[in-house]
Amino acid sequence: FAPGATLSAVVQAESGEFRRVIMTPESYVEQSGRSLEANGFHEVEIHRVSEGYGQILHAFSTYESRNTRQDVEPFARGINSFQLMNDGERWWVVSIYWQAEGSANPIPEKYL
């Protein structure tokens, strides 16, 4: 991760409003690490669209989440939006922004 990188999730409150939850890589581990270790987590990319210019790259990545590799059905699907920067030596993750699929917002066919 690049210094100052962020992880952001779009979540829907009980009121129906959507909001963005912002984390650092470290706070994500603090918040979710125990649950991920206890329940397992395996995410698979099923589709990707990437665009870049100069030192920046954007990847729109459709995912399926399972507790283990052996699980037949995913417990969640959604889209991750990755923003990356190349410093001339390597690519750095600047941000990851995601939204899980829901009944009111199915993933469009073009991203499957």
Question: Model-predicted segments: where are they?
Answer:
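Residues that flank catalytic or metal-binding motifs in active/ligand-binding sites
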Residues: 3, 46, 78-80
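Surface-exposed, charged secondary-structure patches
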Residues: 6-7, 11, 19-71
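Short beta-strand edge/turn micro-motifs at domain boundaries
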Residues: 77-104
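Non-catalytic cap/lid and distal C-terminal segments of serine-dependent acyl enzymes
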Residues: 2, 6, 27-30, 76, ...
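Structural motif
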Residues: 4-5, 56, 81, 90
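A short acidic/glycine-rich loop-to-helix N-cap element
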Residues: 70-74, 103-109
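Short beta-strand segments enriched in hydrophobic/aromatic residues
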Residues: 1, 63-65, 97-100
